[in-house]
């Protein structure tokens, strides 16, 4: 194989569609836009969801729910993740971020009880589930809700 023998795979490249270049091209005169009408005009097109004047589907459905502007979102950390820390260390947001367990400060950090904890830790977080709290204390650690 030589550099001058390189070529793209069959069917991977498409010729540009040149419209309005004579009737024998297949896209002359009306350039594939049909005869007259909204879609034949320049800039003439319907908005997203428009159904020709019929009541659109999204307007036939009832409104539901709302976005709570006071919503709090917590970064989730499971017990199994806390095994990455050394015995007796303090686990807070900075420590979790340094280990790559949380990426950004949301409304805080919540520890959930998924997995097993094998090390004694001091955990300082915003929220903790009952299962996680009992597991941390069973391992000899302490939980401080800040």
UniProtKB/Swiss-Prot annotation:
Keywords: Ribonucleoprotein, Ribosomal protein, RNA-binding, rRNA-binding. PROSITE patterns: RIBOSOMAL_L15 (PS00475). GO terms for cellular component: cytosolic large ribosomal subunit. One of its GO terms (molecular function) is structural constituent of ribosome. InterPro entries: Ribosomal_uL15, Ribosomal_uL15/eL18, Ribosomal_uL15/eL18_sf, Ribosomal_uL15_bac-type, Ribosomal_uL15_CS. One of its GO terms (biological process) is translation. Residues 1-56 are annotated as: Disordered. Residues 1-13 have a biased composition (Basic and acidic residues). Residues 23-35 have a biased composition (Gly residues). It holds the Pfam family Ribosomal_L27A. Part of the 50S ribosomal subunit. NCBIfam families: rplO_bact. Binds to the 23S rRNA. PANTHER family: 50S RIBOSOMAL PROTEIN L15, LARGE RIBOSOMAL SUBUNIT PROTEIN UL15M. Belongs to the universal ribosomal protein uL15 family. This is Large ribosomal subunit protein uL15. It comes from Lactobacillus delbrueckii subsp. bulgaricus (strain ATCC 11842 / DSM 20081 / BCRC 10696 / JCM 1002 / NBRC 13953 / NCIMB 11778 / NCTC 12712 / WDCM 00102 / Lb 14).
């Amino acid at each position: 194989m030589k550099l001058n023998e390189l070529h793209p795979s069959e069917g991977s490249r498409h010729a540009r569609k040149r419209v309005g270049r004579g009737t024998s091209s297949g896209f002359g005169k009306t350039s594939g836009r049909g005869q007259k009408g909204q879609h034949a005009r320049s800039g003439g097109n319907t908005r997203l969801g428009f159904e020709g004047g019929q009541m659109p589907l999204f307007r036939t459905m009832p409104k539901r729910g709302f976005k709570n502007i006071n919503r709090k979102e917590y970064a989730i950390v499971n017990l199994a993740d806390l095994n990455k820390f050394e015995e007796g260390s303090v686990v807070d947001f900075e420590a979790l971020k340094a280990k790559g367990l949380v990426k950004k400060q949301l409304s805080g950090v919540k520890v959930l009880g998924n997995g097993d904890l094998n090390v004694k830790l001091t955990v300082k977080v915003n929220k903790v589930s009952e299962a996680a709290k009992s597991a941390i204390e069973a391992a000899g650690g302490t939980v401080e809700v800040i």
